[in-house]
Protein backbone atom coordinates (compact mmCIF):
# COMPACT_ATOMS: atom_id res chain seq x y z
CA UNK A 1 0.00 0.00 0.00
CA UNK A 2 2.78 2.40 0.93
CA UNK A 3 4.57 1.51 -2.29
CA UNK A 4 1.43 2.34 -4.32
CA UNK A 5 0.99 5.67 -2.52
CA UNK A 6 4.63 6.53 -3.07
CA UNK A 7 4.37 5.63 -6.75
CA UNK A 8 1.21 7.72 -7.18
CA UNK A 9 2.84 10.66 -5.42
CA UNK A 10 5.89 10.36 -7.65
CA UNK A 11 3.75 10.30 -10.82
CA UNK A 12 1.77 13.34 -9.68
CA UNK A 13 4.96 15.20 -8.89
CA UNK A 14 6.23 14.47 -12.38
CA UNK A 15 3.04 15.90 -13.80
CA UNK A 16 3.37 19.10 -11.79
CA UNK A 17 7.01 19.47 -12.75
CA UNK A 18 6.10 19.04 -16.39
CA UNK A 19 3.41 21.69 -16.07
CA UNK A 20 5.84 24.26 -14.69
CA UNK A 21 7.09 26.87 -17.17
CA UNK A 22 10.46 25.89 -18.54
CA UNK A 23 11.90 29.39 -18.68
CA UNK A 24 12.53 32.20 -16.26
CA UNK A 25 9.92 34.96 -16.54
CA UNK A 26 11.62 38.21 -17.44
CA UNK A 27 9.96 41.51 -16.71
CA UNK A 28 6.82 41.74 -18.81
CA UNK A 29 8.32 44.29 -21.18
CA UNK A 30 11.51 46.17 -21.81
CA UNK A 31 12.67 49.05 -23.92
CA UNK A 32 15.50 48.64 -26.37
CA UNK A 33 17.55 51.37 -27.98
CA UNK A 34 17.64 51.09 -31.75
CA UNK A 35 20.38 52.70 -33.82
CA UNK A 36 20.27 52.31 -37.56
CA UNK A 37 21.27 53.82 -40.88
CA UNK A 38 18.39 55.53 -42.66
CA UNK A 39 18.36 56.80 -46.23
CA UNK A 40 16.65 60.17 -46.53
CA UNK A 41 15.46 60.85 -50.11
CA UNK A 42 16.42 64.23 -51.49
CA UNK A 43 15.65 66.03 -54.75
CA UNK A 44 19.27 65.93 -55.90
CA UNK A 45 20.85 63.05 -54.03
CA UNK A 46 20.28 60.46 -51.35
CA UNK A 47 21.70 61.21 -47.93
CA UNK A 48 22.37 58.63 -45.24
CA UNK A 49 22.06 59.43 -41.58
CA UNK A 50 21.90 57.63 -38.26
CA UNK A 51 18.65 57.52 -36.37
CA UNK A 52 17.94 56.58 -32.79
CA UNK A 53 14.69 55.28 -31.38
CA UNK A 54 13.29 53.35 -28.47
CA UNK A 55 10.90 50.51 -28.93
CA UNK A 56 8.84 48.53 -26.49
CA UNK A 57 8.74 44.74 -26.74
CA UNK A 58 6.21 42.34 -25.38
CA UNK A 59 7.44 39.24 -23.59
CA UNK A 60 9.40 37.03 -25.95
CA UNK A 61 7.08 34.04 -26.44
CA UNK A 62 8.08 30.63 -25.14
CA UNK A 63 7.78 28.79 -28.45
CA UNK A 64 7.32 31.55 -30.99
CA UNK A 65 10.17 34.07 -31.37
CA UNK A 66 8.01 36.62 -33.18
CA UNK A 67 6.60 39.72 -31.60
CA UNK A 68 4.47 42.74 -32.45
CA UNK A 69 6.21 46.07 -32.77
CA UNK A 70 6.04 49.19 -34.87
CA UNK A 71 8.90 51.66 -34.61
CA UNK A 72 9.19 55.12 -36.08
CA UNK A 73 12.74 56.27 -36.84
CA UNK A 74 13.45 59.98 -36.73
CA UNK A 75 16.63 61.94 -37.41
CA UNK A 76 18.02 63.58 -34.28
CA UNK A 77 20.67 65.96 -35.56
CA UNK A 78 21.24 68.59 -32.92
CA UNK A 79 20.77 71.59 -35.23
CA UNK A 80 17.33 70.29 -36.15
CA UNK A 81 14.49 71.01 -33.76
CA UNK A 82 11.76 69.42 -35.85
CA UNK A 83 11.42 66.60 -38.31
CA UNK A 84 12.23 68.27 -41.61
CA UNK A 85 9.66 66.44 -43.72
CA UNK A 86 7.41 63.43 -43.76
CA UNK A 87 9.91 61.70 -46.06
CA UNK A 88 12.31 61.56 -43.11
CA UNK A 89 9.94 59.42 -41.09
CA UNK A 90 10.43 55.70 -41.65
CA UNK A 91 8.32 52.89 -40.32
CA UNK A 92 9.74 49.48 -39.45
CA UNK A 93 7.27 46.76 -38.55
CA UNK A 94 7.56 43.20 -37.31
CA UNK A 95 4.58 40.90 -37.44
CA UNK A 96 3.29 38.96 -34.48
CA UNK A 97 2.07 35.35 -34.51
CA UNK A 98 -1.37 36.41 -35.73
CA UNK A 99 -0.01 38.66 -38.46
CA UNK A 100 -1.18 41.82 -36.68
CA UNK A 101 0.99 44.93 -36.86
CA UNK A 102 0.92 47.14 -33.81
CA UNK A 103 -1.05 50.30 -34.44
CA UNK A 104 0.95 52.40 -31.99
CA UNK A 105 4.19 54.09 -33.00
CA UNK A 106 6.60 54.49 -30.11
CA UNK A 107 9.37 56.97 -30.80
CA UNK A 108 8.70 59.94 -28.53
CA UNK A 109 8.92 62.12 -31.62
CA UNK A 110 7.12 65.04 -30.03
CA UNK A 111 9.04 64.53 -26.80
CA UNK A 112 12.33 64.79 -28.67
CA UNK A 113 11.12 67.92 -30.43
CA UNK A 114 10.17 69.43 -27.09
CA UNK A 115 13.55 68.48 -25.69
CA UNK A 116 15.52 70.17 -28.43
CA UNK A 117 13.11 73.12 -28.47
CA UNK A 118 13.91 73.60 -24.77
CA UNK A 119 10.35 73.18 -23.60
CA UNK A 120 9.64 72.79 -19.93
CA UNK A 121 10.29 69.47 -18.20
CA UNK A 122 6.63 69.24 -17.19
CA UNK A 123 5.42 69.38 -20.77
CA UNK A 124 7.95 66.78 -21.85
CA UNK A 125 7.09 64.61 -18.86
CA UNK A 126 3.40 64.24 -19.65
CA UNK A 127 4.15 63.57 -23.31
CA UNK A 128 6.74 60.95 -22.37
CA UNK A 129 4.37 59.41 -19.86
CA UNK A 130 1.41 58.89 -22.16
CA UNK A 131 3.55 57.52 -24.99
CA UNK A 132 5.31 55.09 -22.67
CA UNK A 133 2.02 53.76 -21.33
CA UNK A 134 0.34 53.70 -24.74
CA UNK A 135 3.27 51.76 -26.14
CA UNK A 136 3.16 49.27 -23.29
CA UNK A 137 -0.56 48.69 -23.74
CA UNK A 138 -0.13 48.31 -27.48
CA UNK A 139 2.59 45.70 -27.01
CA UNK A 140 0.40 43.29 -25.04
CA UNK A 141 -3.03 41.69 -25.26
CA UNK A 142 -5.98 43.39 -23.63
CA UNK A 143 -9.79 43.48 -23.98
CA UNK A 144 -11.28 44.89 -27.18
CA UNK A 145 -13.30 47.43 -25.22
CA UNK A 146 -10.12 48.89 -23.80
CA UNK A 147 -8.56 48.87 -27.27
CA UNK A 148 -11.49 50.97 -28.46
CA UNK A 149 -10.91 53.53 -25.72
CA UNK A 150 -7.18 53.57 -26.42
CA UNK A 151 -7.59 54.17 -30.15
CA UNK A 152 -9.92 57.08 -29.49
CA UNK A 153 -7.14 59.06 -27.84
CA UNK A 154 -5.00 59.08 -30.99
CA UNK A 155 -5.63 60.39 -34.49
CA UNK A 156 -4.82 58.56 -37.71
CA UNK A 157 -1.35 60.08 -37.91
CA UNK A 158 -0.60 58.87 -34.35
CA UNK A 159 -0.72 62.35 -32.84
CA UNK A 160 -2.35 62.56 -29.43
CA UNK A 161 -5.94 63.82 -29.48
CA UNK A 162 -6.35 63.67 -25.73
CA UNK A 163 -4.36 65.96 -23.50
CA UNK A 164 -1.46 64.02 -21.94
CA UNK A 165 -2.38 65.59 -18.60
CA UNK A 166 -5.98 64.36 -18.90
CA UNK A 167 -4.77 60.87 -19.81
CA UNK A 168 -2.38 60.95 -16.86
CA UNK A 169 -5.17 61.81 -14.41
CA UNK A 170 -7.38 59.04 -15.79
CA UNK A 171 -4.71 56.37 -15.64
CA UNK A 172 -3.45 57.13 -12.13
CA UNK A 173 -6.96 57.47 -10.71
CA UNK A 174 -7.43 53.68 -10.71
CA UNK A 175 -5.28 51.47 -8.52
CA UNK A 176 -4.78 48.61 -10.99
CA UNK A 177 -3.78 50.90 -13.84
CA UNK A 178 -1.62 53.02 -11.55
CA UNK A 179 0.43 49.98 -10.59
CA UNK A 180 1.11 49.26 -14.25
CA UNK A 181 2.10 52.88 -14.84
CA UNK A 182 4.57 52.80 -11.98
CA UNK A 183 6.12 49.57 -13.22
CA UNK A 184 6.57 51.05 -16.70
CA UNK A 185 8.17 54.19 -15.27
CA UNK A 186 10.42 52.14 -12.99
CA UNK A 187 11.61 50.04 -15.93
CA UNK A 188 12.28 53.07 -18.10
CA UNK A 189 14.08 54.89 -15.28
CA UNK A 190 16.26 51.84 -14.66
CA UNK A 191 16.99 51.63 -18.37
CA UNK A 192 18.08 55.26 -18.45
CA UNK A 193 20.48 54.70 -15.55
CA UNK A 194 22.06 51.75 -17.33
CA UNK A 195 22.34 53.55 -20.66
CA UNK A 196 23.45 56.97 -19.44
CA UNK A 197 26.53 58.02 -21.35
CA UNK A 198 26.31 55.02 -23.66
CA UNK A 199 23.83 56.30 -26.21
CA UNK A 200 24.71 57.26 -29.74
CA UNK A 201 24.80 60.37 -31.87
CA UNK A 202 26.05 61.09 -35.36
CA UNK A 203 29.52 62.56 -35.76
CA UNK A 204 29.17 64.99 -38.69
CA UNK A 205 32.73 64.57 -39.99
CA UNK A 206 33.16 60.81 -39.77
CA UNK A 207 29.45 59.92 -40.01
CA UNK A 208 30.05 57.39 -37.25
CA UNK A 209 28.08 56.77 -34.09
CA UNK A 210 29.55 58.51 -31.05
CA UNK A 211 28.41 58.78 -27.44
CA UNK A 212 25.12 60.56 -27.02
CA UNK A 213 24.87 63.76 -25.00
CA UNK A 214 24.32 63.55 -21.25
CA UNK A 215 21.67 66.24 -21.57
CA UNK A 216 19.29 63.83 -23.31
CA UNK A 217 19.39 61.37 -20.42
CA UNK A 218 19.13 64.18 -17.91
CA UNK A 219 15.93 65.49 -19.46
CA UNK A 220 14.28 62.08 -19.76
CA UNK A 221 15.29 61.10 -16.21
CA UNK A 222 13.98 64.39 -14.89
CA UNK A 223 10.72 63.84 -16.77
CA UNK A 224 10.28 60.38 -15.24
CA UNK A 225 11.05 61.70 -11.75
CA UNK A 226 8.54 64.51 -12.25
CA UNK A 227 5.77 62.06 -13.16
CA UNK A 228 6.62 59.82 -10.19
CA UNK A 229 6.35 62.80 -7.85
CA UNK A 230 3.04 63.76 -9.41
CA UNK A 231 1.71 60.23 -8.92
CA UNK A 232 2.80 60.25 -5.29
CA UNK A 233 1.14 63.61 -4.71
CA UNK A 234 -2.00 62.64 -6.60
CA UNK A 235 -2.53 59.31 -4.88
CA UNK A 236 -0.83 59.96 -1.52
CA UNK A 237 1.12 56.73 -1.89
CA UNK A 238 4.88 56.24 -2.27
CA UNK A 239 6.41 55.19 -5.56
CA UNK A 240 6.57 51.41 -5.84
CA UNK A 241 9.52 49.65 -4.30
CA UNK A 242 11.11 46.51 -5.74
CA UNK A 243 9.03 44.14 -3.62
CA UNK A 244 5.74 45.64 -4.70
CA UNK A 245 6.83 45.68 -8.32
CA UNK A 246 7.71 41.99 -8.09
CA UNK A 247 4.37 41.11 -6.52
CA UNK A 248 2.35 43.05 -9.09
CA UNK A 249 4.38 41.54 -11.92
CA UNK A 250 3.79 38.06 -10.53
CA UNK A 251 0.05 38.69 -10.57
CA UNK A 252 0.05 40.18 -14.06
CA UNK A 253 2.24 37.56 -15.66
CA UNK A 254 1.23 34.00 -15.04
CA UNK A 255 1.42 30.79 -17.00
CA UNK A 256 -2.37 30.53 -16.87
CA UNK A 257 -2.54 33.44 -19.30
CA UNK A 258 -0.44 31.63 -21.88
CA UNK A 259 -2.39 31.00 -25.05
CA UNK A 260 -2.06 28.16 -27.52
CA UNK A 261 0.89 29.75 -29.31
CA UNK A 262 2.86 29.99 -26.10
CA UNK A 263 2.67 33.77 -25.87
CA UNK A 264 2.44 35.24 -22.40
CA UNK A 265 -0.14 38.00 -22.35
CA UNK A 266 -1.00 40.64 -19.80
CA UNK A 267 -4.05 40.15 -17.61
CA UNK A 268 -5.52 43.54 -18.44
CA UNK A 269 -9.17 42.90 -17.59
CA UNK A 270 -8.86 45.36 -14.70
CA UNK A 271 -8.13 48.10 -17.23
CA UNK A 272 -11.69 47.98 -18.52
CA UNK A 273 -13.58 51.15 -17.69
CA UNK A 274 -16.42 51.86 -20.09
CA UNK A 275 -17.83 54.77 -18.10
CA UNK A 276 -15.01 57.21 -18.81
CA UNK A 277 -13.61 57.58 -22.34
CA UNK A 278 -9.84 57.34 -22.44
Curated annotation (Swiss-Prot):
Instruction: Show which residues constitute the signal peptide.
Output: 1-19
Q: Quote the cellular component terms of the Gene Ontology held in the record.
A: spore wall
Q: Lineage of this protein's species?
A: Eukaryota, Fungi, Fungi incertae sedis, Microsporidia, Nosematidae
Superkingdom classification of source? Eukaryota
Q: Name its cellular compartments.
A: Spore wall
From the record, give the cysteines joined by S-S bonds: none
Query: A GO term (biological process) for this protein?
Result: sporulation resulting in formation of a cellular spore
> Transmembrane residues, as ranges?
none
Residue positions the entry lists as glycosylated: 79, 259, 267
Keywords per UniProt = Glycoprotein, Signal, Sporulation
**Designated name of the protein:** Spore wall protein 30
Amino acid sequence: MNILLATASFVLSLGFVKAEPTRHHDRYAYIERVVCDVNFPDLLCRRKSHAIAYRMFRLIPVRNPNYEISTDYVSHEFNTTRVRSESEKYLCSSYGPNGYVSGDVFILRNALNKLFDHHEIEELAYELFIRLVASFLDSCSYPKSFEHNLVRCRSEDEELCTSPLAAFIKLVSRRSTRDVVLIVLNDFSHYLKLEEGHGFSKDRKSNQCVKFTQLYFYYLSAAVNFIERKISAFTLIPVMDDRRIASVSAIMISSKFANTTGNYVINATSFMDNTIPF
